[in-house]
Amino acid sequence: MSTGYTGFEALWHDLFWEAEEAPSEVLLMDDFLQDKDGKSLYVGSGSGRLLGPLVEAEHELGGLEMSPEMVALSREKFPLAEVVEGAWQDHQGEDKYASIVIPAFTFQLFSDPQKQLQRLWEQTDHLYLTLFFPWAELSGDLPQNEWYFDRGIQLPTGESGELETRHKIKEQGGSLVRRHRYTMKDAAGAVVRAEETEQRLRFFTDVALKNLLKKTGWEIEKEIENLGDEDDLVYVATFYLRGC
Ligand SMILES: C[S@@+](CC[C@H](N)C(=O)[O-])C[C@H]1O[C@@H](n2cnc3c(N)ncnc32)[C@H](O)[C@@H]1O
């Protein structure tokens, strides 16, 4: 089983984001990058979905992406956007970056958040971070340890793509393991091929996150809830952080 952004998970990544109809982060990232002079780094730039438009808007931004398939998609779709293939954990920039942006919960895939926040602090004074909080999993709205239908997409080639998810959550340890099953079906509904992946994510309560940021030398300049949408529960939080 793959652990990261290969096969259907890479190929269908953008179609599933579109199907979710969530607000795009590109406006927030554009706002954050407005006053950053010099080169910024986008960690986990994926298929270029957000990197491409930001480079086209003339931000001095380069991508870093560890999945070769995602890098290939990005280079094909947005040839002007520079992307380095590699993992953040092995990355050492030549100079300090004007800023580093990590949208779309990529930071939560890091197994050692404290160490990586310290490394980020060494490589920039300005950090953009978006994190999600798994309310639906914690409240039991989504069943634990059983497969459920997540989303479906129509493929341009006529087939359909289906995503099913199965998760295990440990509230105490702040860890969520999600299995994804991607199934391609032909026009008659017969299965053409199915693939599975597994993701381990960390999540943080408000208090735990603020302690972690304080310990690693980050101060919150701005916090935006739910990408600007109003809701009583905070599912997604975006932080503009400054090294102190
Ligand atoms: C949730 S996807 C988001 C992709 C992109 N930011 C977007 O919003 O379209 C996470 C991406 O981060 C990449 N990634 C995960 N861990 C990484 C790491 N340690 N270093 C570099 N890239 C990483 C994955 O391969 C994947 O493409």
Role assignments for model-derived ranges:
Residues 130-207:
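SAM-dependent methyltransferase
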Residues 1-46:
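Conserved class I S-adenosyl-L-methionine
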Residues 200-244:
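C-terminal lobe and adjacent flexible extensions of AdoMet/dcAdoMet transferase-like proteins
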Residues 48-90:
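Class I SAM-dependent methyltransferase SAM/SAH-binding core
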